[in-house]
Amino acid sequence: MSKALLVLEDGRVFTGMPFGAIGQTLGEAVFSTGMSGYQETLTDPSYHRQIVVATAPQIGNTGWNDQDGESRDDRIWVAGYAVRDPSPCASNWRATGTLEDELVRQRIVGIAGIDTRAVVRHLRRYGSMKAGVFSGKAMIEPLNIEALVQHVRTQQSMLGADLVGEASTLDAYVVEPKGKERFTVAALDLGIKTNTPRNFARRGIRSYVLPASATFNQIADIKPHGLFLSNGPGDPATADHVVALTREVLNAGIPLFGICFGNQILGRALGLSTYKMVFGHRGINIPVIDHATGRVAVTAQNHGFALEGEAGQSFDTPFGSAVVSHTCANDGVVEGVKLADGRAFSVQYHPEAAAGPHDAEYLFDSFVELMAAQR
C-alpha cells in the first residue's frame, strides 16, 4: 500500500496513506473541531492556503453534494486535508459522489490514517505552523525527510500573508432579495461565504457583492443602506486598503456590519491592532459572551488572528466612543466590537453558520434594524 506523509516545519512527521489527489501541497497546518459540516469547511475561502486537520475521526460519511458548498462555484479552498478514518462510500440521499472523488477532481492532496489526535495535541502545544503533505513521486526517493522539512520551511508564513485579493471576486455581482425588496447592501467580498448573501436575501435585501479592491465612490454609486464586511483569509494587518475604505464609510455615516475578517477590519479602522493566535478558533461549538446582555451564544468560528482588547473595554476613536462587545468564554479573545452610537458593529464568529449553530443569526436582524433606523 502506498503511503503519504504530513511533514511539519519543526520536523515532526506523521505517516498515513494518500487521500484525494496524489502529489504535494504546502500550507499552514490548522485543526477544526467540527463534528459535521466538512463540505462547508472545505469550501470556505477563509481556509485558503491552510492544511486542515479534522478532529472528528470519521469524515466523508455523507459524501459530496451540490448544495452545501460555501464558495460560488463549489471550489475547495483548503490547501490540503488530513483525516483519521475516511468513508469509502457516500451514504446520503443528496450525495452526488464521495468526498475522495471530489478531492481528486479538484486536485486537493490529502492524507488519511494518521493519528489526528496526536497532530492536534502537537498543534495546540506548539501552535499552527507551516506544513506539507507528500505522496507518490513527491515523497522523493530515496526518502529524505530533512529535504521535505526544508521544503516545507520555504513557504511564506501566514503572518504577513495578504490573501484577500486571491479569495475575492474579480467582478461585482448581485444577489437578489426573496420577495419584496426592503434594503440594498454593499457587501465587500474579502472571501465571502455564499450563505451570507442568502441570509440577506431572506430578509428582503439586495446584495451588491463587490471585489475587495472596490473604492468608496463605487460603493456610494450603489446608494446602499449599509455596508457589509465579509470573512476572508490571511493576515488582517496587510489589508490597509480595506481599512482605509472602512474609515471612509464610517465618515459617511453608512451603517456597517462585519463578520470574522470583517471584525478585524472594523477593529483596525477604530484603532485596535491585531495579532496571530497560537492555534486559533476553528469549530462549530465555541461559546461567546455578549457583554451587553450577559448571554452566551454557541458559535461557528474560523480564525487564526484576533483583535487586541479586553472584555467590556471602552476606547475613543475618530468616530466616537467604541467598546469591545463580545469575548470568547473559553479564553477571553475579542469576539466583537461596536461603536457606542450603534451605527457600526462586528463579530469574530459566523452568524450565518454553514455549518454550525444558529444562535447568532439574530445579528442579521440587528443589521436590518440599524439600516431601518438610519433610513
From Swiss-Prot:
GO molecular function: ATP binding; carbamoyl-phosphate synthase (glutamine-hydrolyzing) activity; glutaminase activity
Record-linked SUPFAM superfamilies: Carbamoyl phosphate synthetase, small subunit N-terminal domain, Class I glutamine amidotransferase-like
Keyword hit for Ligase: yes
EC code: 6.3.5.5
Biological process annotations from GO: 'de novo' pyrimidine nucleobase biosynthetic process; 'de novo' UMP biosynthetic process; glutamine metabolic process; L-arginine biosynthetic process
Domain of life per record: Bacteria
InterPro entries in alphabetical order: Anth_synth/Amidotransfase, CarbamoylP_synth_ssu, CarbamoylP_synth_ssu_N, CarbP_synth_ssu_N_sf, Class_I_gatase-like, CPSase_GATase1, GATASE
Positions of the Glutamine amidotransferase type-1 domain: 184-375
Chain intervals for the UniProt region annotation (CPSase): 1-180
Active site residues of this protein: 260, 350, 352
Keyword set includes Repressor: no
Pathway terms, separated by semicolons: Amino-acid biosynthesis; L-arginine biosynthesis; carbamoyl phosphate from bicarbonate: step 1/1; Pyrimidine metabolism; UMP biosynthesis via de novo pathway; (S)-dihydroorotate from bicarbonate: step 1/3
Keywords: Amino-acid biosynthesis, Arginine biosynthesis, ATP-binding, Glutamine amidotransferase, Ligase, Nucleotide-binding, Pyrimidine biosynthesis
Catalytic activity: hydrogencarbonate + L-glutamine + 2 ATP + H2O = carbamoyl phosphate + L-glutamate + 2 ADP + phosphate + 2 H(+)
Residue positions binding L-glutamine: 46, 232, 234, 261, 264, 302, 304-305
Function summary: Small subunit of the glutamine-dependent carbamoyl phosphate synthetase (CPSase). CPSase catalyzes the formation of carbamoyl phosphate from the ammonia moiety of glutamine, carbonate, and phosphate donated by ATP, constituting the first step of 2 biosynthetic pathways, one leading to arginine and/or urea and the other to pyrimidine nucleotides. The small subunit (glutamine amidotransferase) binds and cleaves glutamine to supply the large subunit with the substrate ammonia.
Subunit structure: Composed of two chains; the small (or glutamine) chain promotes the hydrolysis of glutamine to ammonia, which is used by the large (or ammonia) chain to synthesize carbamoyl phosphate. Tetramer of heterodimers (alpha,beta)4.
PANTHER family hit by this protein: CARBAMOYL-PHOSPHATE SYNTHASE SMALL CHAIN, MULTIFUNCTIONAL TRYPTOPHAN BIOSYNTHESIS PROTEIN-RELATED
HAMAP family: CPSase_S_chain (MF_01209)
Family in the record: Belongs to the CarA family.
UniProt protein name: Carbamoyl phosphate synthase small chain
Organism: Mycobacterium leprae (strain TN)
Gene label: carA
